A protein has these predicted regions:
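Residue "hotspots" at secondary-structure boundaries inside conserved domains
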Residues: 1, 37-38
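Secreted/periplasmic proteins that engage bacterial cell-wall peptidoglycan
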Residues: 1-24
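Aromatic- and glycine-rich peptidoglycan recognition patches
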Residues: 18-37, 49, 55-88
Length: 88
């Protein structure tokens, strides 16, 4: 798909009736901050310039770019996590 990371997360949350900003940096301040140790499926995992949705068991789903589309990744800590946000 042509979705970028924040467009993907905005789309998923909109499906559940939750409106969030369409820019990754703005998504860092929505909802309630929780620690990564307390992350639950559906939480936003925010990185520098990127955002993903936590699936549980250390896994995320995110838009990786036009070459890859929407992908699951089994290592949420593959880069430094800026914040974890809970909206649900």
């Amino acid at each position: 798909t042509g979705a970028d990371c924040s467009g993907f997360t905005s789309y998923v949350y909109a499906h559940f009736g939750i409106s969030i900003p369409s820019y990754s940096y703005a998504q860092r301040s929505v909802g309630q901050e929780v620690s990564y140790a307390n992350a639950q499926p559906g939480d936003l995992i925010c990185y520098a310039g990127h955002v993903a949705i936590y699936m549980g068991n250390g896994q995320i789903v995110h838009a990786k770019g036009t070459a890859y589309g929407i992908v699951a990744y089994d290592n949420a800590t593959y880069r430094e996590i800026i914040t974890v946000r809970r909206l649900l």
